[in-house]
Curated annotation (Swiss-Prot):
Keyword set includes Ion transport: yes
Gene that this sequence comes from: atpG
Function summary: Produces ATP from ADP in the presence of a proton gradient across the membrane. The gamma chain is believed to be important in regulating ATPase activity and the flow of protons through the CF(0) complex.
Phylogenetic classification of the source organism: Bacteria, Pseudomonadati, Thermodesulfobacteriota, Desulfuromonadia, Geobacterales
Signal peptide location: none
UniProt name for this protein: ATP synthase gamma chain
Swiss-Prot/TrEMBL keywords: ATP synthesis, Cell inner membrane, Cell membrane, CF(1), Hydrogen ion transport, Ion transport, Membrane, Transport
């Protein structure tokens, strides 16, 4: 049986760890509220912009925009969004596994698949497994639209220059504190959504012209989609970390209870042994 001193030391250590996990849970909860508000605000704008683009693209048959043109797919770019920090359960591991699965399943379809990572954890996992086109580190802790726009612009420039023929975005979409959905989204070429034949599509008058608006809005659409995906990932990260730290705190409390019971039993055994020795000594003196 472990000594009283070692058990007491473990109890103190676990209590200190519980204090840290509780503090991290509270910090994540505060950050989650702000991140969730940002996601809720971004979703309607991204959706409406997508709807406007769908109408424009469908009414502009044979558009000259390279962002709408499908070409022979030989090279693909996968943008993988993870976090810069750990201690968030399976948040990063699940995305990295999904990235590996995508690469494995698409190998026959593409001659070359490159990966751009957003977040240090994804880069560390994939750097020795796959060709890394570029890594964006330490951008999620203080995420801003200009940062997301820069990433999107670089992706668009590479696509227009035919460095890759298709671009996919892999990220955790926020659903709730307990739930995040791994989402794979085709970013380029932009594919308008299918509209049911019976669905009424109103006609709009566009100025200066549909073509000019389309050329202006398509890059903006990519920027918005990237920004929304990063916001979703940040909210998912905080939700996953909050859940993980809550679970760790509960496990620590349970362990403290078991160690305390073990300590009390060891202490009781030590007292009993000491009493037996005293009684034995007294008996030997009498004898």
């Amino acid at each position: 049986m472990a000594s009283l001193k070692s058990i007491k030391k473990r109890i103190v250590s676990v209590k200190n760890t519980r204090q840290i996990t509780k503090a991290m849970k509270m910090v994540s909860a505060a950050k989650l509220r702000r991140a969730q508000e940002n996601v809720v605000a971004a979703r309607p704008y991204a959706k409406k912009l997508g709807e406007v683009l769908d109408r424009l693209a469908k009414s502009q048959d044979g558009s000259s925009s390279p962002l709408l043109q499908k070409r022979i797919s030989q090279k693909a770019l996968l943008v993988v969004v993870t976090s810069d920090r750990g201690l968030c359960g399976g948040f990063n591991a699940n995305i990295c596994k999904a990235a590996e699965r995508f690469i494995r399943e698409k190998k026959a379809e593409f001659a070359e698949i490159s990966v751009t990572t957003v977040g240090r954890k994804g880069f560390e996992f994939l750097k020795n497994r796959q060709k890394i086109h570029k890594n964006y580190g330490n951008v999620l802790s203080n995420l801003s639209y200009p940062t997301a726009a820069l990433l999107a612009q670089e992706v668009v420039e590479g696509y227009v220059a035919e460095e890759y023929d298709e671009v996919y975005l892999l990220f955790n979409a926020f659903r709730s504190v307990m739930s995040q959905d791994i989402t794979l989204q085709q970013l380029l070429p932009i594919v308008p959504e299918e509209t049911a034949e019976e669905e009424y599509v109103p006609e709009y008058i566009y100025e200066p012209s549909k073509g000019e608006l389309l050329d202006e809005l398509l890059p903006k659409h990519i920027e918005v989609q990237v920004f929304k995906a990063l916001l979703e990932s940040v909210a998912s990260e905080h939700g996953a970390r909050m859940t993980a730290m809550d679970s760790a705190s509960k496990n620590a409390t349970e362990m403290i209870g078991k160690l305390t019971l073990q300590y009390n039993r060891a202490r009781q055994a030590a007292i009993t042994t000491e009493l037996m020795e005293i009684i034995s000594g007294a008996e030997s003196i009498k004898g």
